[in-house]
């Protein structure tokens, strides 16, 4: 499990995937999200720019990212 502590009020989904190290680049994040491979709070998310806030949970490729 990866934890991301927010410095601002939110982080975008693509940025969170990169920050946690579960994708190598923004392009990888873009395709993972567009292909419906990423879940936010248990729901498939297809918007790479979705704003994540404290308490959100992201799942991708067997990895979990918790936003704090």
Regions found by a protein language model. Give the residues of each.
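A detector for short, charged/polar N-terminal pre-domain segments
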Residues: 1-11
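A positively charged, amphipathic N-terminal helix/segment that binds anionic biomolecules
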Residues: 2-3, 57-68
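A basic, amphipathic helix-loop patch mediating RNA/tRNA/ribosome contacts
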Residues: 9-54
């Amino acid at each position: 499990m990866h934890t991301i502590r927010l410095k601002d009020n939110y982080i975008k989904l693509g940025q969170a995937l990169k920050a946690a190290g579960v994708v190598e680049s923004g392009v990888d994040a873009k395709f993972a999200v567009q292909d419906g491979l990423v879940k936010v709070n248990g729901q498939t998310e297809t918007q790479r720019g979705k704003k994540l806030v404290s308490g959100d949970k992201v799942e991708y490729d067997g990895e979990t990212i918790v936003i704090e």
